[in-house]
UniProtKB/Swiss-Prot annotation:
Places the protein is found: Cytoplasm; Sarcoplasmic reticulum; Mitochondrion
Other information: Able to bind zinc in vitro; the binding sites are different from the calcium binding sites. The physiological relevance of zinc binding is unclear. Physiological concentrations of potassium antagonize the binding of both divalent cations, especially affecting the high-affinity calcium-binding sites.
Primary location recorded for the protein, binned into one broad class: cytoplasm
Keywords, sorted A to Z: Calcium, Cytoplasm, Metal-binding, Mitochondrion, Repeat, S-nitrosylation, Sarcoplasmic reticulum
Entry function: Small calcium binding protein that plays important roles in several biological processes such as Ca(2+) homeostasis, chondrocyte biology and cardiomyocyte regulation. In response to an increase in intracellular Ca(2+) levels, binds calcium which triggers conformational changes. These changes allow interactions with specific target proteins and modulate their activity.
Record GO terms (molecular function): calcium ion binding
Name under which the protein is recorded: Protein S100-A1
EF-hand domain residues: 13-48, 50-85
Record note on modification: Glutathionylated; glutathionylation increases affinity to calcium about 10-fold.
Length: 94
């Protein structure tokens, strides 16, 4: 078994691929696939968002190349940004 960080990396990869490719390119998330991923894996994030257009806004910000889909690199940017925000929140409140 690998380290905690290796396990976390494997989980990031597995979660992405569990949701990608259901509507097309298996290496990208469509808007629907991204929404499903967020609802399944980051439901707390969506619960905090009171904005009904939150997924649209996340998609627009992540989709750096403007192809209407989120590739693995763009997905990792989302996870990294949320991780930084969580780190700041928990360390500032402790």
């Amino acid at each position: 078994m690998g380290s905690e960080l290796e396990s976390a990396m494997e989980t990031l990869i597995n979660v992405f691929h569990a949701h990608s490719g259901q509507e097309g390119d298996k290496y990208k998330l469509s808007k629907k696939e991204l929404k499903d991923l967020l609802q399944t894996e980051l439901s707390g994030f969506l619960d905090v968002q009171k904005d009904a257009d939150a997924v649209d806004k996340v998609m627009k910000e992540l989709d750096e190349n403007g192809d209407g889909e989120v590739d693995f690199k763009e997905y990792v940017v989302l996870v990294a940004a949320l991780t930084v925000a969580c780190n700041n929140f928990f360390w500032e409140t402790s």
